[in-house]
Design a protein with these regions (language model features):
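Short coil turns that delineate tetratricopeptide repeat
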Residues: 58, 92-95, 129
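TPR alpha-solenoid repeat register
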Residues: 63, 97-100
Length: 129
């Protein structure tokens, strides 16, 4: 009886880990497809794929950053800024944070908010001197 119970627990753990791996693969596949579309300048379809990646993993800083880049290319600057801001709160890698803050600076500069642009560029330099 005890052995049977242990087998059920192990089987359930296996299924849960398999589901997690499957979700990670789906997220990665959406990001890769989005990247291909972005590089081909098909920004609307790239946006769709990055949003699908975020549905799979709402805390993906990579998806947020890439979505921000895609939205920026479509002149959707406010939405892009929201994605960069969200990514900046999650991302831990200093180089990636530098890129996020640099892009925020570019958007602030384009919107003629020079004080915020300077602050964003300073944050970028703090993460990647």
């Amino acid at each position: 009886m005890r052995m049977l119970k242990m087998k059920y627990i192990l089987f359930a753990a296996f299924l849960l880990s398999a589901a997690g791996v499957s979700a990670q693969k789906a997220e990665r596949d959406y990001i890769r497809k989005g990247n291909r579309l972005f590089n081909d300048s098909v920004f609307v379809d790239a946006e769709v794929n990055y949003r699908k990646a975020l549905e799979v993993n709402p805390k993906s800083a990579v998806s947020m950053y890439n979505l921000g880049n895609t939205l920026s290319q479509q002149q959707k600057f406010q939405e892009a800024m929201e994605q960069y801001d969200s990514a900046s709160k999650i991302e831990k890698d200093k180089m990636k944070l530098a890129h996020i803050y640099h892009n925020m600076g570019v958007l602030f500069q384009a919107g003629k908010d020079y004080a915020k642009a300077v602050d964003a560029y300073k944050m970028s330099l703090r993460h990647n001197p």
